[in-house]
Amino acid sequence: MKLYKVLNSKTTDKSLCLEVEIDPNYWQATQKKLVGEMAKSIKIKGFRPGKIPPNLASQSINKAELMQKSAQNVMNSIYESVQQEEIVASNDNVIDDYPTIDFKTITEQNCVLLFYFDLIPNFQLPDYKKIKDLTPLTKLTEAEFNNEIEKLAKTKSTMVDVSDKKLANGDIAIIDFTGIVDNKKLASASAQNYELTIGSNSFIKGFETGLIAMKVNQKKTLALTFPSDYHVKELQSKPVTFEVVLKAIKKLEFTPMDETNFKSFLPEQFQSFTSLKAFKSYFHKLMENKKQETILQENNQKIRQFLLTNTKLPFLPEALIKLEANRLLKLQQSQAEQYKIPFEKLLSASNITLTELQDRNIKEAKENVTFALVMKKIADIEKIKVDNNKIKAEIENVIAVEYPFASDEMKKQLFFNMEQQKEFVESIIINRLTTTKIVSYSTH
């Protein structure tokens, strides 16, 4: 027996409203059942608790409370079924999470509910094909991979003094330097006994290359310019003079990794590799994934900024904002649990109230929802779809990279667990493919 029927539906710019009538017999049976439950707590002189006649108990029960509890019961019973109604489930613009529920009629005889489902807004996309300064997606080069292997080898390195030589690329320069802007010493651009690896590009352009071939105790003045995107706004594009003294030159010496010693360089989680070849094969895949993920994240942030700045939505679905704000709060609470810190104590230490945090989360949720809606529309226009084969390949790749030594049985369990989050995995793949597509327009 169906517990309800849809009497009517109405669509506006922002919502789809379903008028739902609860089956009268079910509605009255729900009230009768609750009268019996509520009667157990009623006290009437001359009757033992729970032994009050139904007609007398019904007269003593708070009618408003009975209606409220009955309505909540039937809403819980029909909620998922209403979400699966054809008019809701078949419309991609309907957000079936968190509908607002109101009463049209509620009496002892019948109950009519109104389910308001938010709709995805209609909006104009900005020209996402012309976003500037995106980085092309490139494969891991042999030089990059060898550099990563060298970094591992350098964990067992020793520093030796080579102050009798001229400063070269790759050396560690021990320097005193003073930055001068507008004839004034700049404390934030000055230091003593600073260790600078030449070629690290950790200083502004021209600084490190300007020191090459210097000798110990030599002084040098560098006339440079802060970049236009320098992190200190007041210094962007400003001329700066650096007075530098080279105090010492050092170099890292290390033993190259080979088949006989490679395990001594590896972290504990990699100790099960039995050959350098097997480790390098895995490590190459790990570094390839890391490079691609880094480029994608950098591009994604630039794309996000462009889309948020240049997209105007007529409204944002409250259901999605609520869903995302709740997700952010749960994430913050789980992080506190991870560090075994009571959430209230973490809020106090951060000098923020729960209300202030929730307001901040709502602001972030609005940006996240806007970005997600715009990316979804781009994915639809570009006909980006993900089938089960792609989801399977993604899960298998994650397991291969994150759990290289898992047994076959454990891999099966991991696959099963991740497959239960199929929608989440699908959203990650679609976001990656959409980002990649936008980058392809920008870099060609």
Swiss-Prot record:
It is an enzyme of class 5 (isomerase). Involved in protein export. Acts as a chaperone by maintaining the newly synthesized protein in an open conformation. Functions as a peptidyl-prolyl cis-trans isomerase. Belongs to the FKBP-type PPIase family. Tig subfamily. Its EC number is 5.2.1.8. Keywords: Cell cycle, Cell division, Chaperone, Cytoplasm, Isomerase, Rotamase. The keyword Chaperone applies. GO terms for biological process: 'de novo' cotranslational protein folding; cell division; chaperone-mediated protein folding; protein transport; protein unfolding. GO terms for cellular component: cytoplasm. Residues 170-255 form the PPIase FKBP-type domain. It is found in: Cytoplasm. PANTHER family: TRIGGER FACTOR CHAPERONE AND PEPTIDYL-PROLYL CIS/TRANS ISOMERASE, TRIGGER FACTOR-LIKE PROTEIN TIG, CHLOROPLASTIC. GO terms for molecular function: peptidyl-prolyl cis-trans isomerase activity; protein folding chaperone; ribosome binding. PROSITE patterns: FKBP_PPIASE. Consists of 3 domains; the N-terminus binds the ribosome, the middle domain has PPIase activity, while the C-terminus has intrinsic chaperone activity on its own. It catalyses: [protein]-peptidylproline (omega=180) = [protein]-peptidylproline (omega=0). Pfam families: FKBP_C, Trigger_C, Trigger_N. This is Trigger factor.
